[in-house]
Amino acid sequence: CLPDPAALSRRCTHPGGERRGGSGRGGAASGRRRVRFVSAVPGPEEPGSPRGGRRRRAEASCAKPRRARTAFTYEQLVALENKFRATRYLSVCERLNLALSLSLTETQVKIWFQNRRTKWKKQHPGADGAAAPAPPAAARCSPSPPRPAALPGQTFPSYAATSALFPAASPFPPGRPRRRTLRSLLGARVPRASTPRTSENPPRLCPSAPGVRNRVFLLRLASTKRKNTYML
């Protein structure tokens, strides 16, 4: 516990520590005593103090490490600028090929093009809409299929060449009557699909055919024989 300030003021009269009316060794011994008051609130730390250095180290360790900037060579910058003049948006395949040719990573090429586009838009504020959007990734990487005419050993004649391959036949060949051609055309018709007939209308046999008569007679004879056998 801290001593009472009123009691201390009685003992210590001035910074020298001498007592009023005190003399001898007792007064000198009591005057040598000095009281130090330690404040509970810490004061401002000096830049060279050890506590300030520790706090700076802790803040530096907690801060996010800064990524090092990529140092491009002159040849790489020239190649990137030429590619940017050709197109401001790279596809995935073009970006990968450019990174391999320049010994860079795909991320470095992507970030360089993003920064270059931002710089170009600042230099040309009215030409933002002129930049063509990047095509989708599926359409960019997939190569276009070859045309049918480019395949070896295959030819696809156009519609205009069909007349040369299949010449139009004359409607009526010369020297032949018109009736024969009509009969030949009618005889070459494709037969229609026969519809199944119901049991109510059985097919009628032509009585004029001799073979059909014999079959009908045999069927009737067989049916009468069966009836006779059943009756017996």
UniProtKB/Swiss-Prot annotation:
One of its GO terms (molecular function) is DNA-binding transcription factor activity, RNA polymerase II-specific. Residues 1-64, 122-150, 185-208 are annotated as: Disordered. One of its GO terms (biological process) is cell differentiation. It is found in: Nucleus. GO terms for cellular component: nucleus. Belongs to the NK-1 homeobox family. This is Homeobox protein SAX-1. It comes from Gallus gallus (Chicken).
